[in-house]
Regions:
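Intrinsically disordered, low-complexity regulatory segments
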Residues: 1-153
């Protein structure tokens, strides 16, 4: 199955509708044929705060601890903003780990922020980003969405 990750709920719904066919709605995603469509809610995943890293004294600000560089052990966590701790996080993570999920599509906005949102969600789930395909469409019209997905094949 192909997992499509959109940046917002409204975009996920528009994609599911454009894909056509019978759509089954679940908590945090829509299944349409061989496609699973899920969505973020803005910045679902952010870097952990310095004081959340074990083995470092980064909790108190001090010149002695600068620069703070967690490389290579970046830690990701679900964001604190309202609504971030919902089914979207659980479902996108679970959907990426399903045995029948064989490809990822980045349907977030084709800009820096959209790319960051997508990559952070995938990193938080602990799956490979190597085979992710960008959708590259900002439009919400069915014809434009269909054309974008057809050009990926």
């Amino acid at each position: 199955m192909r997992l499509i990750i959109a940046e917002k709920h409204s975009v996920g719904q528009a994609i599911a509708q454009a894909l056509g066919g019978h759509a089954e709605r679940h908590d945090g995603y829509i299944e349409v044929g061989d496609d699973l469509v899920t969505w973020a809610q803005g910045h679902l995943v952010d870097l952990a705060a310095p004081d959340e890293y074990q083995g470092h004294d980064w909790g108190r600000w001090s010149l002695d601890t600068l620069p703070i560089d967690p490389t290579p052990d970046w830690q990701w966590k679900v964001g604190r903003e309202k609504g971030a701790r919902t089914g979207s996080t659980r479902s996108s993570r679970g959907l990426m780990r399903r045995d029948d999920t064989d490809s990822l599509v980045n349907a977030c906005d084709p800009d820096r922020e959209g790319e960051a949102i997508f990559r952070r969600i995938v990193a938080h789930a602990g799956v490979s980003q190597a085979d992710a395909t960008p959708c590259g469409s900002r439009a919400l019209e069915e014809d434009a969405i269909r054309a974008a997905f057809e050009s990926m094949r």
